Amino acid sequence: METSILKTAVKNFLGNSPDWYKLAIIIFLIINPLIFFFINPFVTGWLLVIEFIFTLAMALKCYPLQPGGLLAIEAVIIGMTSPQQVGHEIANNLEVVLLLIFMVAGIYFMKQLLLFAFTKLLLSIKSKRMLALAFCLASAFLSAFLDALTVIAVVISVSLGFYSIYNNFITDQNDVINAKHDNHIDTAKKKQTLEQFRAFLRSLMMHAGVGTALGGVMTMVGEPQNLIIAKNVNWDFVTFFIRMAPITLPVFICGLLVCFLVEHFKLFGYGTELPERVRQVLEDYDKKTSAKRTHKEKAQLIAQALIGIWLIVALAFHLAEVGLIGLSVIILTTSFCGITEEHALGKAFEEALPFTALLTVFFSIVAVIVDQQLFTPFIQFVLQVSETSQLSLFYLFNGLLSSVSDNVFVGTVYINEARTAMQEGLISHKQFEYLAVAINTGTNLPSVATPNGQAAFLFLLTSTLSPLIRLSYGRMVIMALPYTIVMTLVGLLCVEFLLIPVTDMMVHWGLIALP
């Protein structure tokens, strides 16, 4: 009896995850305290970061909340950080938490409008290259005014809608979320078409994801860390855009060029066309829904469009915290679309809350990074070199650390360290402003390398869409690789050779004023 209970308990641990994965997590939990107490806390800190990245990489084997959460709880228990520091990190990032809870749910209630708009876009543009550019451009434009997580939530919602339409057509299975295996598909031809459609959606999702980085780096509201950096150097919306332009505009152009080339030459998993059969299904669906659209549904679309305008205006002018704007979207859409039942409201939060919990665990890891001073050696090294080398090194170290850590945290740490150096007289105010540009671009551009570098990518990886279209951590890294290389190198070259002369030119033209 006791043996069977023990076996069941072992089997219950991390559920249906592979045995080797369960064993790896147990080994991590055993060795971390030993290394912390008997070898070196600093080494343990970096080991914990690597282990957490491992749980993210294996997201399709087991949702990272459980294994990552166990590692974080143990880190607090053994003294790598404190509950107070974890609470402090969560408080510092409350805006992001509110964004996830309310904004993503708000977008859920605008799904009807978004599916309508993106279906028209998808069906009206026949060329895959042009469609990829359209998705990338749309994501970049929206991310300049909205948060990247909001934009990626929109695109996930739309892609899930496309997938649902075709999945329901080829099967009798209406619950697309549970249709993660292909056993319900009766012919090889249908399976082949579905695989092609998955590849098509994967490429669109990655183009859209990179688009959020290309647009998000440009403005002070594009990413949470942008706002923090802008406040430190006292830049307004227009000044921030102009000061970033010597790096962001060339990177944006090169990013769009990469988008076109990988589609044209079918590289890194891109280039798959929309299957003609799927296009036909989507066109038929669009015609049927248009023909059957009632006055009530038309009124709902108009209401959602007006609320969408409110959303963009409110975010662009930062009329309130992003999460509170999201809450207003929930209230307005549900009020004017007639959604008043509690269970209907609850569905909107199903997508975001697991990721919100995961991000909170991530803040626990960030608390360890702070308490164990894991980034201190990098910062001290950079501040010791000459001013001309500081810009490139700040950019590179920000990019490297943002690829393995939260880019909000990295940007905040580096801008605070740069400000402290200025206050202590180690660097001039002019150099501080140049460093702010290097820090902002460094945290936003190279961090597309891995899903844990960009919160939007991590949200995509852990969404219900990823297993449906077979978008794993490894595949995301590979598909992001051409963008990572080009955006990082072009950004570095612009920081090294264009930032100072172009800024001086803009000062001469009277566009900006240097201290």
From Swiss-Prot:
Q: Which GO terms describe its cellular component?
A: plasma membrane
Cellular location(s): Cell inner membrane
The record gives the membrane topology as: Multi-pass membrane protein
User: What terms describe the molecular function in GO for this protein?
Assistant: sodium:proton antiporter activity
Membrane-spanning residues where? 23-43, 45-65, 96-116, 136-156, 204-224, 245-265, 305-325, 349-369, 393-413, 449-469, 480-500
Highest rank taxon of the organism: Bacteria
Which keywords does this Swiss-Prot/TrEMBL entry list? Antiport, Cell inner membrane, Cell membrane, Ion transport, Membrane, Sodium, Sodium transport, Transmembrane, Transmembrane helix, Transport
Predominant location category: membrane
InterPro entries for the chain: Na+/H+_antiporter_NhaB
Catalytic activity as recorded in UniProt: 2 Na(+)(in) + 3 H(+)(out) = 2 Na(+)(out) + 3 H(+)(in)
- Listed Pfam families: NhaB (PF06450)
- NCBIfam families from the xrefs? NhaB, PRK09547.1
Give the similarity note. Belongs to the NhaB Na(+)/H(+) (TC 2.A.34) antiporter family.
Q: Which HAMAP family match?
A: NhaB
Q: What is the role of this chain?
A: Na(+)/H(+) antiporter that extrudes sodium in exchange for external protons.
Name it.
Na(+)/H(+) antiporter NhaB
Its source organism is Photorhabdus laumondii subsp. laumondii (strain DSM 15139 / CIP 105565 / TT01)
